[in-house]
């Protein structure tokens, strides 16, 4: 009896998914998940060659989300996504525009940035 060898594990296809964008002041993280919340692909701006102050730019966030969108389309067959944005960073709008320009249909954009109601004490003021 012959043994059949498989070349590799084929990725499951997900037509719909969720893309989480976490934009901090120093970096932007992009996480592609299925509807249940299981992570399929994750990336950040720093992983694509941007370093230092260039990581916090909208251009860098757009490039990283472009790579994440292409991976979601080619590897997982995603077509429809909903976007969840967290954080006060600058790259959120550029990241969403890059997702739409790559061919993903964005059904909803939710901003779930945590807003403190006079929570923790702020850092001391910077004296210049």
Curated annotation (Swiss-Prot):
Q: Per its record, what are the GO molecular function terms?
A: rRNA binding; structural constituent of ribosome
**Membrane-spanning regions, if any?**
none
Q: Which SUPFAM superfamilies match?
A: Translational machinery components
Q: Which UniProt keywords apply?
A: Ribonucleoprotein, Ribosomal protein, RNA-binding, rRNA-binding
Cross-referenced Gene3D superfamilies: Ribosomal protein S11 (3.30.420.80)
Entry's Gene Ontology cellular component terms:
ribonucleoprotein complex; ribosome
One Pfam family, short name:
Ribosomal_S11
Superkingdom of this protein's organism: Bacteria
| Entry annotated with the keyword Nucleus | no
Q: Quick check: keyword Ribosomal protein in the entry?
A: yes
Q: Which GO terms describe its biological process?
A: translation
Please give the family membership noted in the entry. Belongs to the universal ribosomal protein uS11 family.
Supply the PANTHER family for this chain: 40S RIBOSOMAL PROTEIN S14/30S RIBOSOMAL PROTEIN S11
Question: Briefly, what is this protein's role?
Answer: Located on the platform of the 30S subunit, it bridges several disparate RNA helices of the 16S rRNA. Forms part of the Shine-Dalgarno cleft in the 70S ribosome.
Its quaternary organisation is: Part of the 30S ribosomal subunit. Interacts with proteins S7 and S18. Binds to IF-3.
Name the record gives this protein:
Small ribosomal subunit protein uS11
Classification lineage: Bacteria, Pseudomonadati, Pseudomonadota, Alphaproteobacteria, Rickettsiales
């Amino acid at each position: 009896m012959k043994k059949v060898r498989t070349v590799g594990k084929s990725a499951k296809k997900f037509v719909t998914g969720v893309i989480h964008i976490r934009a901090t002041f120093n970096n932007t993280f992009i996480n592609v998940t299925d509807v249940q919340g299981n992570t399929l692909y994750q990336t950040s701006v720093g992983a694509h060659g941007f370093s230092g102050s260039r990581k916090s730019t909208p251009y860098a966030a757009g490039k990283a989300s472009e790579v994440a969108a292409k991976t979601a389309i080619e590897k997982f067959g995603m077509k429809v996504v909903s976007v969840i944005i967290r954080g006060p960073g600058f790259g959120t709008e550029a990241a969403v525009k890059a997702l739409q320009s790559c061919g993903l249909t964005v059904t909803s954009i939710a901003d779930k940035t945590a807003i403190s109601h006079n929570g923790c004490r702020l850092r001391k003021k910077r004296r210049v």
